[in-house]
C-alpha cells in the first residue's frame, strides 16, 4: 500500500478497506492507560484477545470488559458487555473500532509480546 497523501475521506476509507494483510495490524492499535504508558514507555499497542479495555466513545462509553475476539478484516474488536438488542430481543455483539478504546490491562500469555514490551 502506497502512503496515502489525500485528505479526502472516501480515499482514506478506500485505503483502509483495501489495506494488505500485513498492514492491518497497525489499524488495530489502541491507546494504553496512563499507568501502562508509564510502565511500558509507549502510548499504544495492538489489541489482542484477552486484553481488558475501556470504551471511550460512542453509546457504550465507560463500559469496561475483556476483548472476546478481534476482526482483522474489518479492523474491529468485540468487547464483552458491548452489545445491541435485535428486534426479536436477542443480544448480538457490537464491534468497536480500536481507536475508541483504551487498554487498561494487558494479556501477557504470549511470551513474545511480553518480551517486546519489556524491550528485550
Swiss-Prot record:
Q: Which SMART domains match?
A: KOW
SUPFAM superfamilies named among the record's database cross-references: Translation proteins SH3-like domain
The record's section on Gene3D superfamilies has: 2.30.30.30
- Looking at the record, which segments are called Disordered? 1-26
Q: Name any one GO molecular function.
A: structural constituent of ribosome
Record flagged with keyword RNA-binding: yes
State whether keyword Transcription regulation applies: no
Q: Might you name a Gene Ontology BP term for this protein? A: translation
Q: Where is the composition biased (Basic residues)?
A: 10-24
One GO term describing the cellular component: large ribosomal subunit
Q: Which InterPro entries match?
A: KOW, Rib_uL2_dom2, Ribosomal_uL24_CS, Ribosomal_uL24_euk/arc, Ribosomal_uL24_KOW, Translation_prot_SH3-like_sf
One Pfam family, please name it.
Ribosomal_L26
Keywords tagged on the record: Ribonucleoprotein, Ribosomal protein, RNA-binding, rRNA-binding
Disulfide-bond pairs as recorded: none
Assembly notes: Part of the 50S ribosomal subunit.
PANTHER family in the record:
60S RIBOSOMAL PROTEIN L26 FAMILY MEMBER
- What does the UniProt record say this protein does? One of two assembly initiator proteins, it binds directly to the 5'-end of the 23S rRNA, where it nucleates assembly of the 50S subunit.
Question: Family, per the entry?
Answer: Belongs to the universal ribosomal protein uL24 family.
The name this protein carries in UniProt is Large ribosomal subunit protein uL24
* Organism (species): Methanospirillum hungatei JF-1 (strain ATCC 27890 / DSM 864 / NBRC 100397 / JF-1)
Q: What is the lineage of its organism?
A: Archaea, Methanobacteriati, Methanobacteriota, Stenosarchaea group, Methanomicrobia
Amino acid at each position: 500500500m502506497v502512503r496515502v497523501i489525500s485528505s479526502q475521506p472516501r480515499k482514506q476509507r478506500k485505503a483502509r478497506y483495501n489495506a494488505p494483510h500485513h498492514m492491518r495490524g497497525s489499524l488495530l492499535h489502541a491507546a494504553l492507560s496512563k499507568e501502562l504508558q508509564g510502565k511500558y514507555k509507549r502510548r499504544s499497542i495492538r489489541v489482542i484477545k484477552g486484553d481488558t479495555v475501556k470504551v471511550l466513545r460512542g453509546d457504550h462509553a465507560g463500559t469496561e470488559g475483556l476483548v472476546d475476539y478481534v476482526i482483522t478484516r474489518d479492523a474491529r474488536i468485540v468487547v464483552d458487555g458491548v452489545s445491541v438488542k435485535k428486534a426479536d430481543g436477542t443480544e448480538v455483539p457490537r464491534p468497536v473500532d480500536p481507536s475508541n478504546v483504551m487498554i487498561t490491562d494487558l494479556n501477557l500469555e504470549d511470551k513474545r509480546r511480553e518480551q517486546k514490551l519489556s524491550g528485550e
